[in-house]
């Protein structure tokens, strides 16, 4: 495979022109509502300045980056004319990639990287529908349906993409091999190789990102601490807290921060290195609130405990 990075800076004149158009539009919007706070207040609290500050400092630069990258992407597709375009997400510039593939008549396939389950109430519907805009309801012509839960989701939230029932393509697959399991345990947790191993693998999100179907950082910590208290009372059991690699988790919490917030105990250890496949292979049970790891475990016939100490959400019923 050839990796072609998309630069964030194109021709200076083009970039300045696009930035000026956006800035002018934002200024007009702000001025048009200068005497009308109806849309920018709640219970007599005005948040207009906060909104426009967010637009100028965060949204506008992101839009400029996507605009620049889409320009290069357009040129790249015109030059290379690929036979097919395959992506695992449709967020940001990858959404533009799906649109351009339709524009140029290039077949495109979305293979979602995340878990999707059928919404069970109005709150889950709001968040899973939003989540689906990057993975299930996208501009890509074809959609790989990798699990029965994804299919059930699409029955409630239809997509314009043509569905292809593929089974798991991106999910982790492990060997049912006792010797390999033993060797991995000796390598990863030699002092607990003979214990019952629980692997906690969940996906916390920031407070602004789907705060119902995923754990907020504070809930993530509370749920793990609750588990630690339980595991401490059971002999010959060890809890592995599997965290995402640093480049992912730094968006929400660093390993050092999590370590500082957890109860001190010898019954658990924190791991962020190595592949999830290895940890799934050594687990007697996966523990999670909401994550693709739940589906990956079930696909590999590893028992799963869906754990929410508050009892508000159940990922798969």
For each feature predicted by the language model, list its residue ranges:
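Donor nucleotide-activated moiety binding/catalytic core segment of transferases
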Residues: 69-71, 219, 242-300
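Conserved catalytic-core segment of nucleotide-activated headgroup transferases in glycan assembly
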Residues: 166-258
């Amino acid at each position: 495979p050839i990796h072609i990075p998309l630069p964030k800076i194109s021709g200076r004149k083009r970039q300045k022109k696009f930035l000026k158009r956006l800035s002018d539009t934002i200024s007009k919007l702000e001025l048009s509502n200068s005497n009308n706070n109806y849309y920018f207040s709640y219970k007599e609290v005005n948040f207009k300045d906060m909104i426009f500050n967010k637009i100028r400092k965060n949204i506008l630069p992101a839009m400029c980056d996507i605009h620049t990258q889409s320009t290069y992407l357009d040129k790249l597709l015109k030059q290379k004319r690929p036979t097919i375009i395959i992506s695992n997400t449709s967020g940001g510039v990858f959404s533009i990639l799906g649109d351009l593939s339709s524009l140029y008549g290039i077949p495109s396939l979305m293979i979602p990287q995340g878990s999707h389950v059928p919404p069970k109430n109005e709150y889950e519907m709001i968040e899973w529908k939003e989540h689906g805009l990057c993975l299930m309801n996208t501009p890509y012509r074809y959609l790989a349906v990798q699990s029965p839960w994804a299919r059930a989701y699409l029955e409630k939230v239809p997509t314009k993409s043509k569905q292809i029932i593929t089974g798991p393509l991106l999910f982790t697959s492990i060997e049912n091999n006792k010797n390999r399991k033993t060797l991995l345990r000796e390598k990863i947790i030699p002092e607990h190789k003979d214990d019952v191993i629980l692997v906690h693998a969940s996906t916390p999100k920031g407070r602004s990102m789907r705060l119902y179907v995923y754990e907020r950082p504070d809930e993530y910590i509370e749920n793990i601490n609750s588990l630690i208290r339980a595991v401490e009372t059971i002999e010959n059991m060890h809890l592995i807290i599997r965290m995402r690699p640093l480049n992912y988790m730094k968006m929400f919490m660093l390993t050092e921060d999590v370590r500082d917030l957890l109860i001190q105990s010898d019954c658990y250890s924190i791991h962020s290195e190595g592949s999830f496949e290895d940890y799934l292979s050594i687990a007697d049970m996966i523990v999670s609130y909401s994550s693709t790891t739940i589906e990956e475990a079930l696909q590999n016939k590893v028992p799963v405990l869906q754990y929410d100490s508050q009892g508000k959400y159940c990922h798969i019923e």
